[in-house]
UniProtKB/Swiss-Prot annotation:
Superkingdom, natural source: Eukaryota
Gene3D superfamilies registered for this protein in UniProt: Ribonuclease Inhibitor
A Pfam family hit: LRR_14
LRR repeat spans: 164-185, 187-208, 210-231, 233-254, 256-277, 279-300, 302-323, 325-346, 348-370, 371-392, 395-416, 419-440, 443-464, 466-487, 489-510, 512-533, 535-556, 558-579, 581-603, 605-626
Entry function: Acts as a Ras effector and participates in MAPK pathway activation. Probably acts as a regulatory subunit of protein phosphatase that specifically dephosphorylates Raf kinase and stimulate Raf activity at specialized signaling complexes upon Ras activation.
Keyword Iron-sulfur appears in the UniProt entry: no
Similarity comment: Belongs to the SHOC2 family.
Species in which this protein is naturally found: Drosophila sechellia (Fruit fly)
Compositional bias segments (type: Low complexity): 1-19, 74-86, 672-683
Keyword set, alphabetical order: Leucine-rich repeat, Repeat
Biased segments, Gly residues type: 26-49, 661-671
Annotated region (Disordered), positions in chain: 1-54, 74-150, 661-683
Compositional bias of kind Polar residues: 99-117
Name of the protein described by the UniProt record: Leucine-rich repeat protein soc-2 homolog
């Protein structure tokens, strides 16, 4: 029996208001990931623009149920560069009504006229809605319950058949079944069914021989019908986020495919028949359970993007070297023990993801991949790189070697960092930064050496003049060299968890510094020059041995976060009241801190104040428990400045009540001005 024969003609009742939407200026959506049509009339979502029932390209966008149809768009989390543009749909209310009165469920005005002949008890209730753009009341029917999605699909398919629509979007519509009448939509070139509840496709899907794009992502598919092989023009097939335990065999017979998404399924193996898909340029097998990638991958010589990340691969076949057009190869989050030497054949490679595997080395042939701009092997067990490899990759701008077993910098000298602006060597076993290693790295702005074994910094640190972010946390540094003053472009300096006892006075030269983190060191005194860091926003000093803050701290007008908890503070300077931008203040666990300065109440932007485990004898416990606002209010109420203000208020009242006194307005302004002036002087 021919599944694609027309058979009996189905009912041609169409969604009239949606049809009107297409004839009244809908804008067609575009792209393989799908979007809705333009704004339609009434409350029903508009489809793409058509010219009545013509042979031109047309679109039907369906949003499921009655009521206003929202925009329907598709997303591609894998590769925006390889995904077609998304369309967009819309809906309008009163605009469509002005052109042709419609009901909220898409029926024409003729149906509303028929309601007049209905018995009163069955007649739809009429309500009046006043639209903001018009004072004239407009009648509309009370919204009924949404029509079953599967019933609306039948109507949409009928219209698709009758109008020769080429692009049909039924996404996000709670569809469970695609009816067999889909076979009649022979003009379709794009069909979007993503984000539904479809468990299987009907065999009649194979009748859509003109289909080029088929989006089935985010459903519950476990298989595909064999008849799909009749769709011999299919180029884009999206099966992401389904329940496929294997790649359906029919896919291997779709030799016209150029883009195949199989991400986030339950696939455990890839058959040798994969070699038949010679036209593939993009293949995503990300987030499955694949343990082996066979030699068939080498037959896909047109591949430009291959994503097999987040699987269980232990090895790659040597045949991967045949995919000479690859520009992006993502292998991260697998269990790879090695990379084949043939990787060096991929001279077009720009991005190679090897993060979080079990690699102990990388092949020297990687130096042939000179188009790479990023080298990232984070989260492996690598102890050293092949000699001169990084220097050969002269286009590198970012190098990430963090979370490995490096005991020293890669061999290759200063030449390997010539064009690099970011280096990350966090969490290794490196005990020194070689002198002059960054002498050619004129563009280096970011260096992360956190969690290593550094005991000192190189004598030429003063030459790192373009450095913007320097992270030296969790090492064993005992001293910060005076030459740090030359890093005048520095904005972020992180020195937490070291063994520093003092900070050099030259720190004041870092006028662009926004973040200074000195947590968990052995610092007893801060230099007065800290007050020169006028751009500073975060100052973290917790867990040190600081007994007092310098009065110059009051000059840090941009400071929003100050943490001095777990120190030996005896008092806070009055100048802390000048920190008008301060939002968070941590002074908890200072066992000698018994009182707070009244000037703290001048920090009007303070949102968080932690005074836990401070023996504040002057502030009642119930006030302390009430949070920063209550503490600040208490400080205001008990401030000596308040007594001065009260005196002036009393004086003002006396003057205003005196016989022949001037108007209240003038006296009030003068007194308030005087009080404000004194307040300003205090600040």
């Amino acid at each position: 029996m021919n599944l694609c024969s027309s058979g009996a003609t189905a009912s041609t009742t169409s969604l009239s208001s949606t049809g009107q939407a297409e004839r009244s200026g809908g804008v067609p959506g575009g792209g393989a990931e799908g979007g809705g049509g333009g704004g339609g009339s009434g409350n029903s979502g508009g489809g793409g623009k058509t010219s009545d029932v013509s042979a031109e390209a047309s679109t039907l966008c369906f949003a499921g149920g009655s009521g206003t149809a929202g925009a329907i768009t598709g997303t591609d989390e894998l590769s925006n560069a390889n995904s077609p543009a998304n369309g967009a749909g819309g809906a309008s209310g009163s605009t469509g009504s002005a052109q042709q009165p419609t009901g909220s469920n898409g029926h024409s005005h003729l149906h509303n006229e028929n309601n007049a002949n209905m018995p009163p008890e069955t007649r739809p209730k009429m309500v009046t809605v006043k639209h903001p753009e018009s004072n004239k009341p407009k009648p509309t029917t009370k919204k009924s319950k949404p029509i079953q999605a599967d019933q609306d699909v039948i109507k949409a398919l009928q219209r698709c058949r009758d109008e020769g629509i080429k692009r049909l979007d039924l996404s996000k519509s709670s569809i469970t079944v695609i009816p067999s009448t889909v076979k009649e939509c022979v003009h379709l070139t794009e069909l979007y069914l993503y984000s539904n509840k479809i468990g299987q496709l009907p065999p009649e899907i194979g009748c859509l021989v003109s289909l080029r794009n088929l989006a089935l992502n985010e459903n519950s598919l476990t298989s595909l019908p064999e008849s799909l092989q009749n769709c011999s023009q299919l180029k884009v097939l999206d099966l992401r986020h389904n329940k496929l335990a294997e790649i359906p065999s029919v896919i291997y017979r779709l030799r016209s495919l150029t883009t195949l998404y199989l991400r986030f399924n339950r696939i455990t193996a890839v058959a040798d028949d994969l070699r038949q898909l010679v036209n593939l340029t993009m293949l995503s097998l990300r987030e499955n359970k694949i343990r082996e990638l066979g030699s068939a991958i080498g037959a896909l010589v047109n591949l430009t993007t291959l994503d097999v990340s987040h699987n269980h691969l232990e090895h790659l076949p040597e045949d991967i070297g045949n995919c000479v057009n690859l520009s992006a190869l993502d292998l991260q989050h697998n269990e790879l023990l090695d990379i084949p030497d043939s990787i060096g054949n991929l001279k077009s490679l720009v991005r190679l993801g090897m993060r979080y595997n079990r690699l102990s080395s990388v092949p020297a042939t990687l130096k042939n991949c000179k188009s790479m701009d990023e080298f990232n092997v984070e989260g492996n067990g690598i102890t050293q790189l092949p000699d001169g490899m990084l220097a050969s990759l002269s286009g590198l701008t970012t190098i990430t070697l963090s979370r490995n077993q490096f005991a020293s910098y890669p061999t290759g000298g200063p030449a390997q960092f010539t064009n690099v602006y970011s280096i990350n060597l966090e969490h290794n076993r490196i005990d020194k930064i070689p002198y002059g290693i960054f002498s050619r790295a004129k563009g280096l702005t970011k260096l992360n050496m956190k969690e290593n074994m550094l005991t000192a910094l190189p004598l030429d640190i003063g030459t790192w003049v373009n450095m913007v972010e320097l992270n030296l946390a969790t090492n064993a540094l005992q001293k910060l060299p005076d030459d740090i003053m030359n890093l005048q472009n520095l904005e972020i300096l992180i020195l937490s968890n070291n063994m520093l006892k003092k900070i050099p006075n030259t720190i004041g030269n870092l006028r662009r510094l926004r973040i200074l983190d000195l947590e968990e060191n052995r610092i007893e005194v801060l230099p007065h020059e800290i007050g020169l860091l006028h751009e500073l926003q975060r100052l973290i000093l917790q867990t040190n041995q600081i007994t007092m803050l310098p009065r110059s701290i009051g000059h840090l007008g941009n400071l929003t976060h100050l943490s001095v908890s777990e120190n030996n503070l005896q008092f806070l300077p009055e100048e802390i009241g000048s920190l008008e931008s301060l939002e968070n203040l941590y002074i908890n666990q200072n066992p000698g801190l018994e009182k707070l300065p009244f000037e703290l109440a001048l920090c009007q932007n303070l949102k968080y104040l932690n005074i836990d485990k401070c023996p504040l004898s002057t502030i009642p416990p119930e006030i302390q428990a009430g949070g920063p606002s209550l503490v600040l209010q208490w400080l205001k109420m008990h401030s000596p400045y308040r007594q001065i203000d009260c005196y002036y208020q009393y004086e003002l009242q006396t003057v205003n009540q005196a016989p022949g006194a001037g108007g209240n307005g003038g006296g009030g302004a003068a007194a308030a001005g005087g009080s404000a002036s004194r307040s300003s002087d205090r600040r």
